[in-house]
């Protein structure tokens, strides 16, 4: 694949639209041709389908030259066996190809599943073919490869001629039919079947509360949902909730807080002897499993849940009683497993598997390293993050344009020449190194500007080799070009301090900040509505799942309260869920809110934020200020869902993020927006954002306070840069002091001379 190093800007809607939203190999190939069919994909209850994009292909596969290939991986769940599979291939190809000599081969794990001819009549137009994939080719871990073989003339040809191309759309669809396998009732299989890393689909895991949950039960459930959310990672996770009702199909987590034996829809829960974990079959579905988490009180229920999320690798058996669970050390700020460490340089080998750091070919795809930066890195007047890149490459005998490209989030950062043997400096020493393995070790240091990064960023390194043409009938591609990045290459953000202007819903959306500053959420609290139902519970668990996705650590220390107890968590960052009149804080804190909804009456503040491109954030917070300058009030029965951020009225420096809707189901729109996806063209930004279906409208960006800490010298620089008057005064006083010292020194010297 050829990755695009340059970013594509996203269009932004105008303010008027925002207001409107408020209102409303040939031999084998020939043998495999019989596997090709043209019937449409049929949906079945025992299978699923995934696009190549869902399997990790971000863009179109561009296959060029006389022979090229690209691939994606797909895996099969541990509790499923494959009955059959099809690939609905969407592709196009060059009109210049010779039909008798050109084809696209579909391979699974190196075996040809089908060979598609490329006739003249279909050239240059979108094509679709349904390829039958034999079930025996599919194993637990699989590689689906698309190989293009192309020729445009019977005589001598240029192997990289521009007419040799085929494109595979990433909307091509892999459909798999499966049969379930019953797993044993053993806690040792956890996190299976509730999460399987081989499944690329979004996780949907029901939670069942045996009785109406109290705060402790919600804290236990939050730890579990954040654990699953962290495992789900890029897939996303939702947690539909019921009270006392088991799902008709599939898996679920059941939380039971009772001192006595009880029955839950046919599931007999024995009288607990302490925090208990039990794995059983779902009585409604023999292929489903129930993880029953039991405690005699809230403390025991939380201990049982924490035992699952922290100790699942050592659990075994159908049922266990947790006798002790100790926390050996408290979490430290910014130590989330998913975040780039800010107290030491980090090796690239810690962020990506070593085999993914090597590529081959003249124009291979980019080596992409995913990294999550702490969202509050203060980058004012900082040159950038030092990247010490160690790499090896195969030097060509002669070349002029071979280079190593370094990019960040599809933006070009630096180009480094890859000199040929004839252009190498270093004489015999370098040539001696080449004799060892025909690759040459090199090193380069560059600075990556944080202003070009987001909390979820992608470092891209791409080797590009110059193809030297020898002349007609002499050109041939020898696939001996190799490039690799040393896993000991380092990124170092230790020079950055933590300081950020708030409120900022963008960093909440991307990283759950400021709640995720401590990975276990020990300085965070969730304020639930007074009379919450299953919609509010689902929203709460889904948001906690998002926090787990951001940190990679379960929220074992989150506090859950209601409005009447909010003073008890005054020293914490607060996530407030509100539906209609169920949240008293909407009235108590009305003066701090940029939006309100009371029945049919809705009021929103507006600014010029929608007119700005928010994909770029200035390192100067003043440039990001878009305070409210307009207000609108209207009546309507439609659903109104919004997110707002503001400083906590209970303690300065603490933050509140409010997720509100005039209808309980509206909270699910907000949580879906946090998960995001292809249906969402915009993301949540600013200090006020409205969600209408898949449309997100960020209305206000009013950053009023700061969280974090700067050292004294940096803080003084920052403050003086923000206040011209103070800078002039300090400059004047400094000049006065220096002038006075010079005057006194000269006067003393004159007195000594006269004496």
Curated annotation (Swiss-Prot):
Pfam families: BcsB. The keyword Transmembrane applies. One of its GO terms (biological process) is cellulose biosynthetic process. The chain crosses the membrane at residues 724-744. GO terms for cellular component: plasma membrane. It is a single-pass membrane protein. Keywords: c-di-GMP, Cell inner membrane, Cell membrane, Cellulose biosynthesis, Membrane, Transmembrane, Transmembrane helix. The keyword RNA-binding does not apply. Pathway: Glycan metabolism; bacterial cellulose biosynthesis. Binds the cellulose synthase activator, bis-(3'-5') cyclic diguanylic acid (c-di-GMP). PANTHER family: CYCLIC DI-GMP-BINDING PROTEIN. This is Cyclic di-GMP-binding protein. It comes from Pseudomonas fluorescens (strain SBW25). The gene is bcsB.
